[in-house]
Regions:
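Core RecA-like ATPase module of SF1/SF2 helicases and allied nucleic-acid translocases
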Residues: 1-147, 152, 156-169
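Conserved active-site motif detector
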Residues: 156-277
Length: 277
């Protein structure tokens, strides 16, 4: 019952490649005739994007992108806007106001500060300089109080107001959510189904069968899990979990890094898988 926000990130892709942003940029490119975006065209493009992606759960992020650019630029140059979007990440537009709890990785919390910080750290990482820098970033997010929960001994020698040891064993959660990235889907599978993928929007429900995701209404295959993700799922299946549901998280533009410049981009579907036991 506690108001909570998750600071999401886009592992493996830029905010620039989000389908909602690509639609807005294409709308402008087809109609703008001067370096400055006319106010009427800017508002028209926003309305068209909001209408086309009315059911998308990513539109709040997109609208905050518009608002931030408007706040920073009274005169809207198309080149400035493209640079602004290209250099932005999803974390830049996550609104955590009004949330009593903010859930985030250390990397995504960089640049933010909180009254109280709870760090959950496992001991299965190599203790190198990079890890120490990451821990430092997490520790320095706290303005008042810092709580570190760990199964390792990295912090044993540090002075603290309180040390507690918990020897209890905890069962696995009844439900988990796996957020798929580019590494978790078979990218070549998306070639040839761009129209079908672009017909979907963030939040749309999908069907899962045999490591493949299908549209709920037409039962068309729109994503196939990678070998890496299939192994991950099998590990969870062995622990008694099953896939309860799947939903579209992002639709993004993608093409291989070594692809010729003239090769068209592919629309890639990234989903959230909810597992229960």
């Amino acid at each position: 019952g506690v108001p909570c926000k998750l600071i999401q990130s886009m592992d493996g892709f830029r905010f620039w490649n989000l389908s909602e942003m690509r639609y807005f940029l294409r709308y402008l490119d087809k109609r703008v005739t001067t370096p400055v975006i006319p106010g009427e065209l800017w508002e028209e493009a926003k309305r068209a994007t909001s209408k086309t992606y009315a059911r998308s759960q990513n539109m709040d992020l997109v609208k905050r992108c518009f608002e931030q650019f408007e706040h920073l630029n009274q005169t809207k140059y198309i080149s400035d806007f493209k640079e602004f979007v290209f250099e932005s990440s999803m974390e830049d537009f996550c609104d955590v106001s009004g949330s009593e709890v903010v859930v985030s990785t250390i990397h995504k919390a960089k640049g933010r500060e909180f009254d109280d910080v709870y760090m959950l750290l496992t001991d299965n990482y190599i203790k190198n300089a990079e890890l120490k820098r990451r821990y430092y970033v997490g520790i320095t997010r706290a303005k008042n109080r810092l709580f570190i929960h760990t199964n390792g001994h990295c912090f044993d020698r540090l002075t603290a107001d309180r040390h507690d040891r918990d020897d209890r064993s905890y069962t696995l959660p009844e439900e988990i959510v796996l957020q798929l990235s580019h590494r978790d889907v078979y990218l070549e599978f998306f070639k040839g189904i761009k129209r079908e993928v672009l017909a979907l929007q963030s939040g749309d429900r999908l069907q899962y069968r045999d490591f493949t995701l299908y549209t709920e209404k037409t039962d068309l295959p729109v994503a196939k899990l990678s070998v890496r993700m299939q192994k991950t799922l099998n590990d969870w299946f062995a622990k008694g979990y099953r896939v309860k549901s799947a939903t579209v998280s992002f639709i993004v533009a993608w093409k291989p890094k070594d692809a010729p410049k003239e090769e068209p981009e592919t629309a890639v579907l990234l989903a959230d898988l909810t597992l229960t036991r």
